[in-house]
């Protein structure tokens, strides 16, 4: 399947699932392809045929944007190494879940979460350790007794009860033994970031007014490989912010406004060479001098809202 077709299929799935989907934008390199939101959830998606093409830098950028939008990063692809991604299986690239298109459909449209995750050595499942312990104790089985039934050591059974995953074969053997389910589904929305440092070491040159904005009482989070150069936060407001010449930001104003609509945020472009205040769609176009002349963050919010 071509990259474009895969992206179109992903967009169709998210629309079928009731999500509003951002426009596709032409920009290289880019940390994400589309953002989907339904008023409650935001999913930032990177669509790429071979998931091994994702670098740590790509993953960090994707994770940073998703977390700062209170959303979830997700990779959708077709292959890993020399094999196709399995339907119903979750792969992980730098802490970010990666799945194929059918798994995306199952989760978001059919409300059927994946059960399997890929790890070095094969495919595995998570089991409920607490449920396993209850079943074992109800049958008055010791750790060793259950280990003999399953063909594993008592120490391994103890690890299962402590939350360690297991092979599909062992999990099915457990369920057959107790005639009860112990396999836990994987919630794609509940992934946790492995990147403990939210910012790159350097501050991008594109945001030279960062210090001035922060002196006004707002927080600025630089963004990389995105249509907007920063997220500006104040109180409950998030502003997707572009910065540069009027010609440069005018080309991005439309997609920034579109993403702000999907994510229920605001949009602003700060122009370095034009002080004429105006709007392009949802995006406030404001001159750099005009922005820095504002006294309070509320003054900016009022300009954006009015």
From Swiss-Prot:
It comes from Methanospirillum hungatei JF-1 (strain ATCC 27890 / DSM 864 / NBRC 100397 / JF-1). This is Putative HTH-type transcriptional regulatory protein Mhun_2548. Residues 132-189 form the HTH cro/C1-type domain. NCBIfam families: PRK04140.1 (NF003162). GO terms for molecular function: DNA binding; DNA-binding transcription factor activity. Residues 143-162 bind DNA. Keywords: DNA-binding, Transcription, Transcription regulation. Pfam families: HTH_3. InterPro entries: Arc_TR_HTH (IPR020886), Cro/C1-type_HTH (IPR001387), Lambda_DNA-bd_dom_sf (IPR010982). SUPFAM superfamilies: lambda repressor-like DNA-binding domains.
């Amino acid at each position: 399947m071509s990259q474009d077709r895969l992206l179109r299929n992903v967009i169709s799935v998210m629309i079928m699932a009731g999500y509003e989907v951002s426009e596709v934008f032409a920009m290289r390199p880019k940390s994400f392809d589309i953002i989907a939101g339904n008023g409650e959830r935001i999913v930032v998606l990177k669509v790429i045929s071979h998931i091994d093409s994702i670098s740590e830098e790509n993953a960090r950028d994707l994770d940073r944007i998703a977390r700062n939008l209170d959303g979830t990063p997700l990779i959708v692809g077709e292959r890993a190494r020399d094999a196709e991604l399995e339907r119903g299986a979750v792969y992980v690239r730098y802490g970010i879940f990666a799945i194929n298109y059918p798994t995306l459909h199952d989760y978001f449209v059919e409300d059927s979460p994946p059960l399997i995750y890929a790890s070095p050595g094969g495919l595995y499942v998570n089991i409920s350790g607490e449920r396993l312990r209850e079943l074992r104790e109800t049958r008055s089985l010791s750790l060793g007794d259950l280990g003999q039934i399953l063909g594993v050591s008592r120490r391994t059974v103890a690890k299962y009860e402590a939350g360690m995953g297991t092979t599909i074969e062992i999990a099915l053997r457990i369920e057959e033994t107790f005639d009860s389910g112990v396999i836990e589904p994987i919630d794609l929305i509940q992934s946790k970031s492995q990147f403990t440092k939210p910012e790159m070491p350097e501050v991008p040159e594109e945001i030279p007014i960062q210090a001035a904005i922060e002196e006004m009482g707002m927080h600025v989070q630089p963004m990389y490989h995105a249509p907007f150069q920063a997220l500006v936060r104040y109180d409950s407001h998030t502003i997707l912010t572009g910065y540069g010449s009027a010609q440069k930001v005018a080309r991005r104003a439309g997609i920034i406004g579109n993403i702000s609509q999907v994510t229920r945020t605001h949009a602003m472009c700060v122009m370095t060479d034009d002080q004429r205040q105006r709007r392009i769609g949802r995006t406030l176009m404001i001159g750099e001098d005009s922005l820095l002349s504002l006294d309070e963050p509320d003054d900016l919010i009022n300009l954006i809202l009015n």
